[in-house]
Amino acid sequence: YEMLRSLVGSEMCIRDSSNGVDTKYFSAASDTELNPKFISGWLDKENNAVSDYLVFAKSVLRIPEAHEMIARYTVLDEEAKRLILLRPYQIHAIEAIRDASKTGKSGFVWHTTGSGKTLTSYKATRNLLMDIPAIDKAIFLIDRKDLDTQTTMAFQAYANNDLIDVDETDNVFDLKKKLKSDDRQVIVTTIQKLQRLITRKLQEGTPEYHKIKNLKIAFVVDECHRAVTPGTKREIERFFGNSLWYGFTGTPRFAENPYPQMGDLPRTTQELYGDCLHKYTIQNAIHDNAVLGFQVEHNGPKNKKDETDSNLYVTESHMLKVLEVILNKSYYKLGFQNGKGKTYEGLLTTSSIQLAQKYYDLLKMVKEGKTTLKIDEKIKQVLPDFPKFAITYSVTENEEGSHVNQQKMQESLDDYNKMC
């Protein structure tokens, strides 16, 4: 059977539909506006599907849950001119942050890339300010200038019909002015501006120094695995003694991929921020069709475990074998049979920036004929200049090794400009 129920709050309308076997919810829209990708099924906190309509009704449609869905977990996007309903994993993450904040605990959220972290972090930041009267400011920290404007625009589009103010910071002096203000507000700024403020632009012992230092602040950190290094976070925490920290990341640091050893500084995301409050991994997202899936092909002997020594994967001999498969044994996969101008492009992803740089340098050597790997003549007949390649990665100013990364990026940009 078909069940359709509307919940009306102000001018907002949420609908759910069930056939008794499966249940979905979505925001009200005309037939021409209803997009299947905005129709969500409910998940529990462990990301297990909830299809039974009675269980769904108890989780979402009861009072006060229905009121909270409308008041807390909908966003009127001013730019897109539509009502956005948060997905279950976004709601569970925000609730987990709220619960942690009530007991004065920090933590991090592990949500995969492409799962809507900007919207989740906006609502989390907004709700921290709305729910906890003791918090003076909620600061959303990002690690790049270009993201500063981009994120602020997204936040302001979400906040246009909300009860809070979202302000960006033009410079360090603007950040200081907003922190000195008595207004309770969400501030979007970069880690560089904040660090410069507390280390160079405040004179100890002055009234403004004490006012800013004594603020009760909730920090929400975008891309927390890289945005704030352990040393920088400790420096900021020592200045802002009354602070809570909530990080968002799609790639947490674990014991297997820790931060470099720097004295007694934390080396994993958990050590740096606290417990993982909620997770929604790439496996969950692919299962829910929230992101593009993968066609996986394994190259290597069957029924054999991976090498336990990960250093074997970064040797030149292994990397050349990887490139041999990509460059010489992917003739049909790359569409060379279609002829010049009809071939496909590919993307090689690596486990680190350093490994990407090594592959880039090795590809340059292959192209210059300085390795044992030679491009097959059959391929060169179609594309004589094969392979043409470039490299991209995020260059930050506040990570260990950032100077080397910036230098290598400049070299690769010079290569790219010559190629063009």
Predicted regions and their residues:
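Flexible phosphate/Mg2+-sensing switch loops adjacent to catalytic phosphate-binding sites
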Residues: 132-136, 163-167, 257-276, 367-387
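Conserved C-terminal RecA-like helicase domain
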Residues: 310-420
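Conserved helix-turn-beta segment of the N-terminal RecA-like "Helicase ATP-binding" lobe
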Residues: 146-171, 365-373
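Conserved RecA-like ASCE P-loop NTPase motor core of nucleic-acid helicases/translocases
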Residues: 110, 136-144, 343-352
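ATP-dependent helicase/translocase motor core
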Residues: 1, 6-138, 146, 150-161, ...
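Inter-Walker segment of RecA-like/P-loop motor cores
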Residues: 157-200
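Switch/connector loops and helix/strand junctions flanking conserved nucleotide-binding motifs
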Residues: 22-35, 148-151, 195-199, 228-229, ...
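Signature of the SF2 helicase/ATPase Hel1-core->accessory helical subdomain module
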Residues: 27-29, 191-309, 319
